[in-house]
Amino acid sequence: MKTFLILVLLAIVATTATTAVRFPVPQLQPQNPSQQQPQEQVPLVQQQQFLGQQQPFPPQQPYPQPQPFPSQLPYLQLQPFPQPQLPYSQPQPFRPQQPYPQPQPQYSQPQQPISQQQQQQQQQQQQQQQQQQILQQILQQQLIPCMDVVLQQHNIAHGRSQVLQQSTYQLLQELCCQHLWQIPEQSQCQAIHNVVHAIILHQQQKQQQQPSSQVSFQQPLQQYPLGQGSFRPSQQNPQAQGSVQPQQLPQFEEIRNLALQTLPAMCNVYIPPYCTIAPFGIFGTN
């Protein structure tokens, strides 16, 4: 290749030399012909020198280095493009239609709170029953002073002599108010009804023991020592003795009105209006 390039360059220089010799000839025609010949030979020698100097052009050999253009082969590495086609087949798991039956148990889940509500209602009912039982126990033991206070007022209203001394009566008032304050407000009306109910049943028991005698409210439910404030709660449950008979309803209304006038004012307790008109037995006293 080098020799071929050298030969080509020599041929090119030869042709250029001949052409260079030809062109200056017509320019030198007006001059003497003897002077033209040496001028023609001088450039030939110089041109040969130029040829020797121009021979270094072969350093153009590094140009074949661009042959690495076959580096286009890496483009063949782009063949992985068909690989992404595989994920397109993967979306076939769109069968998640199966989870749609799963939400069905969710519809059954809201039904569970319904059972919880029922349990809460049952618990509330049990709590209410327990409160009623506790209230009844309190009434049996703690509200006896209130019963005696109402009986004392009943005797005074009917012009009977006071059975209890003033000091004992004042102590009963204090005890009655203390126990009445411990009862929740929503149960105070029931407490007063139970007080009246206990008085009626107590008198009914006395009437059964003395059928020939009329019902009398002169004696208190408990006998208190004169001048002393100690008392013993009744061991018997007055509510278990029976229920108020229809003929005793007027007596119940009379005592209830008296109790509603005496106890709230004495203890500064608020009693709702419906307590004065509520029919007997609505609070489960019978």
From Swiss-Prot:
<keyword id="KW-0732">Signal</keyword>
<dbReference type="InterPro" id="IPR036312">
    <property type="entry name" value="Bifun_inhib/LTP/seed_sf"/>
</dbReference>
<keyword id="KW-0020">Allergen</keyword>
<dbReference type="InterPro" id="IPR001954">
    <property type="entry name" value="Glia_glutenin"/>
</dbReference>
<dbReference type="Pfam" id="PF13016">
    <property type="entry name" value="Gliadin"/>
</dbReference>
<feature type="compositionally biased region" description="Low complexity">
    <location>
        <begin position="72"/>
        <end position="92"/>
    </location>
</feature>
<protein>
    <recommendedName>
        <fullName>Alpha/beta-gliadin</fullName>
    </recommendedName>
</protein>
<comment type="function">
    <text>Gliadin is the major seed storage protein in wheat.</text>
</comment>
<keyword id="KW-0758">Storage protein</keyword>
<feature type="region of interest" description="Disordered">
    <location>
        <begin position="51"/>
        <end position="120"/>
    </location>
</feature>
<feature type="compositionally biased region" description="Pro residues">
    <location>
        <begin position="56"/>
        <end position="71"/>
    </location>
</feature>
<keyword id="KW-0677">Repeat</keyword>
<feature type="compositionally biased region" description="Pro residues">
    <location>
        <begin position="93"/>
        <end position="104"/>
    </location>
</feature>
<dbReference type="GO" id="GO:0045735">
    <property type="term" value="F:nutrient reservoir activity"/>
</dbReference>
<comment type="similarity">
    <text>Belongs to the gliadin/glutenin family.</text>
</comment>
<feature type="compositionally biased region" description="Low complexity">
    <location>
        <begin position="105"/>
        <end position="120"/>
    </location>
</feature>
<keyword id="KW-0708">Seed storage protein</keyword>
<feature type="signal peptide">
    <location>
        <begin position="1"/>
        <end position="20"/>
    </location>
</feature>
<dbReference type="InterPro" id="IPR016140">
    <property type="entry name" value="Bifunc_inhib/LTP/seed_store"/>
</dbReference>
